[in-house]
Amino acid sequence: MPIQPLKKELVSFLEPYMPENAGVLGEQEKPYVILTYAQSLDARIAKIKGTRTIISHQETNTMTHYLRYKFDGIMLGCGTVLVDDPGLNCKWWPDDEPKPEHFAEHSPRPIILDPNGKWKFEGSKMKTLFDSGDGKAPIVVVKKLPEVVEENVDYLVMQTNFTGKVDWHDLFIQLKSQFGLKSIMVEGGGIVINDLLQRPHLIDALVITVGATFLGSEGVEVSPLIEINLKDISWWKGTRDSVLCSRLVSHS
C-alpha cells in the first residue's frame, strides 16, 4: 500500500536527531543509535501480548519510512518479528528524485535479535522483499550458529548472560565493525525497548509516537524499572498522533 506524502515540517522537526547531524559517526566506536516506537497514551505498544496492534496514524507511519531512509540498520527482537512478520524496508524517497524501481537501495539492513534461533528468513515477508529487490537480507544475532545456515543471511554470534540477553555495548560495536553500520534505529519490541531505556549511554536519541488511544491494562507496557530523565525535548503534533524527540540523561 502506498504511503502518504511526508509532512515537510516533520523533516525539520526530526533533523537535529538524525545521524548526519551527530558529527561523530566516523569517530565513535559504536553506531549512532535511536530508539523509536509507537505507544498508546497509557504507554502500551500492543493491546495483548503476541498480537499486532496498529497505533500510528498514516502520516507518522510515513515518518517511520523516512527514518528508515536515514539509517543503515533497523533492529527488532525475534518475538516482535514472529508476531508481525515485518518487511522492515523503506518506501519513502526524496521528492527531487525519481521513484526507484526497487526499494532495497534506500532500505536499512534488518537486524533480528534471535539468540535461540526461533525465526526463519525463508517464508518471511523480509525474504519476499529481498527476492523482489525491495529489501535487504538480515543480520541475525544468535548465541550459536544454527544447524542449517540460511542463504543470504549473515549471522552474528554473541554470548548471552544468565538471563539470555546479549551485552548491548558489545553488540553495537560488532554491528559497526563487522557490517559497517554507522547508524541503527531500534524499533522494538517491549523487552528490547525497556532494556535499552535503562542504558541511556548507548542511546543517542528517542523518537516516540504517541497515539490518541488507550490500550488497557492487559496491553504490553513500556516502562523501565528505573527512573529515566530526558533532555533536548521537542514535540510535534499531527492529525491524530504526537511525536516526542529527545535525548536521555545519562546516569551520574
Swiss-Prot record:
Transmembrane segments: none
Annotated pathway: Cofactor biosynthesis; riboflavin biosynthesis
Domain of life from the UniProt record: Eukaryota
InterPro entries: DHFR-like_dom_sf, RibD_C, RibDG_C, Riboflavin_Biosynth_HTPR
GO MF term list: 5-amino-6-(5-phosphoribosylamino)uracil reductase activity; NADP binding
GO BP terms in the entry: riboflavin biosynthetic process
Keyword hit for Oxidoreductase: yes
Catalytic activity from the UniProt record: 2,5-diamino-6-(1-D-ribitylamino)pyrimidin-4(3H)-one 5'-phosphate + NADP(+) = 2,5-diamino-6-(1-D-ribosylamino)pyrimidin-4(3H)-one 5'-phosphate + NADPH + H(+); 2,5-diamino-6-(1-D-ribitylamino)pyrimidin-4(3H)-one 5'-phosphate + NAD(+) = 2,5-diamino-6-(1-D-ribosylamino)pyrimidin-4(3H)-one 5'-phosphate + NADH + H(+)
Binding site for NADP(+): 80, 84, 166, 189-193
Enzyme Commission designation: 1.1.1.302
Keyword NADP attached: yes
Alphabetized UniProt keyword annotations: NADP, Oxidoreductase, Riboflavin biosynthesis
Cross-referenced Pfam families: RibD_C
Enzyme type, top EC level: oxidoreductase
NCBIfam families: ribD_Cterm (TIGR00227)
Complex formation: Homodimer.
Family assignment from sequence similarity: Belongs to the HTP reductase family.
Function text: Catalyzes an early step in riboflavin biosynthesis, the NADPH-dependent reduction of the ribose side chain of 2,5-diamino-6-ribosylamino-4(3H)-pyrimidinone 5'-phosphate, yielding 2,5-diamino-6-ribitylamino-4(3H)-pyrimidinone 5'-phosphate.
Protein name from the UniProt record: 2,5-diamino-6-ribosylamino-4(3H)-pyrimidinone 5'-phosphate reductase
Organism: Kluyveromyces lactis (strain ATCC 8585 / CBS 2359 / DSM 70799 / NBRC 1267 / NRRL Y-1140 / WM37) (Yeast)
